[in-house]
Amino acid sequence: MKKNVVNKAWRGLKDAVPACLFAAGCLSSAEAHAQLSSNPDKFLGNITTSYSVDYGNEKYYTLWNQITPENESKWASIEGNNDGWNWGGCDNAYNYAKKHNFPFKFHCLIWGAQYPGWLDKLSTEKQYEEIVEWMDAVKKKYPDLPMIDVVNEAVPGHQPAPYKEALGGDGKTGYDWIIKAFEMAHERWPDAILIYNDYNTFQWQRSQFIDLVRTLRDAGAPIDAYGCQSHDLTDMSVSSFKSAMVEIQNALKMPMYSTEYDIGTSDDALQLQRYK
């Protein structure tokens, strides 16, 4: 297991359990978020879609103090054409985080969706070479990433990478390829918080999620935290959510990030109620 150390500026993040990385509509009340956005010990983050920040009367940095590109840091967005690198969208969010001195999360290195289509045409050996090249390119571009979603949505029935054989396939643990991905990420970013991220974790596939993350942890994978996507919270009671979160945390005993929280309404009053 990797040593739990990160760059000094973000060292406190590993103790922020649960910290929040929300994909949600912004509330109209900036005052409610201003206290969190200026708190150095915790953060409430959001996504940026096509770098849609600081438009209108409310500035992103007054509402949130963490940023994640929704699509711009995915492999297909950056290398849709083989060796045709497009870093512009990711650069915008990365530089914005630097400017305002809050964490940037890279989402994501390995996923069974939004990866380059040309990868499917390659042999397993060539796929591995391309994965190495991809991670090396990200490392060269962003050597100081504080947080990384290393693998996304690999619970059975979700979207495990079709190219997983290039990383060793299921192997003895059933998730050898995920372990390999974390090892490769740790080699390049030994001080980053390395995260496994998935959905349906609070309700429908909680046990499968726990099994996957626990398998990684017990196998010695350099995983620092897990992200529980929160798309399914809108119709979940507070007591049920608390019970599910306690069950997950007791089983895994690792830092948790509540990620990708959606509030499917444009009604500000209802959004405020949901946040509370």
Task: Give the ranges of each region predicted by the language model.
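Boundary/entry segment of secreted carbohydrate-active catalytic domains
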Residues: 35-70
